[in-house]
Curated annotation (Swiss-Prot):
SMART domains: eIF-5a (SM01376)
Organism: Schizosaccharomyces pombe (strain 972 / ATCC 24843)
Residue numbers of Phosphothreonine PTMs: 78
InterPro entries: IF5A-like, IF5A-like_N, NA-bd_OB-fold, Rib_uL2_dom2, Trans_elong_IF5A_hypusine_site, Transl_elong_IF5A_C, Translation_prot_SH3-like_sf
Protein name (record): Eukaryotic translation initiation factor 5A-1
Keywords for the protein's UniProt record, in alphabetical order: Cytoplasm, Elongation factor, Hypusine, Phosphoprotein, Protein biosynthesis, RNA-binding
Residue numbers carrying Hypusine: 52
Additional remarks: There are two genes for eIF-5A in S.pombe.
Post-translational modification: Lys-52 undergoes hypusination, a unique post-translational modification that consists in the addition of a butylamino group from spermidine to lysine side chain, leading to the formation of the unusual amino acid hypusine. eIF-5As are the only known proteins to undergo this modification, which is essential for their function.
Entry similarity comment: Belongs to the eIF-5A family.
Length: 157
């Protein structure tokens, strides 16, 4: 008898792809796309007319969702481009420990692998935590990376 292989389907991302293909002509402003291997949010799109030899081209300007860097790409409208699977989750801030956020989901599980962001958002999170405010942190994840994107005060109960 052959040994049965045990596959764990409990996790929501068991074997799930980090991206999916989409035709350039179907991409939209404020949507997401992968440019030069980075997950980006589309901020501007334009289409050039069909030339004498070839297809209409789509010019995409997008910002990296993690570092804000600007990327541009030009591709025939009939070609496929990768679109990242982008997930946004909200967590309650429990603690800040050694540059990392200790977060808790609504069902009580903890998450402590999100780095405290640098700059204005990081300062806002630290100040709010030091003042003893209950903060809700929005975490965005795509293509194996994740970062804190925003924070707000938790609704008082």
């Amino acid at each position: 008898m052959a040994e049965e292989e045990h596959v764990d389907f409990e996790g929501g991302e068991a074997g799930a792809s980090l991206t999916f293909p989409m035709q350039c002509s179907a991409l939209r402003k404020n949507g997401h796309v992968v440019i030069k291997g980075r997950p980006c949010k589309i901020v501007d799109m334009s289409t050039s007319k069909t030339g004498k030899h070839g297809h209409a081209k789509v010019h995409i300007v997008a910002l990296d969702i993690f570092n804000g860097r600007k990327y541009e790409d030009m591709s025939p409208s009939t070609h496929n481009m990768d679109v990242p699977v982008v997930k946004r989750d909200e967590y309650q801030l429990v603690n800040i420990d050694d540059g990392y956020l200790n977060l808790m989901t609504t069902d009580g599980t903890t998450k402590d692998d999100v780095r405290l962001p640098e700059g204005e958002l990081g300062n806002e999170i630290e100040e709010g935590f030091d003042e003893g405010r209950d903060l809700i942190i929005t975490v965005v994840s795509a293509m194996g990376e994740e970062t804190a994107l925003a924070c707000r005060d938790a609704p008082s109960s």
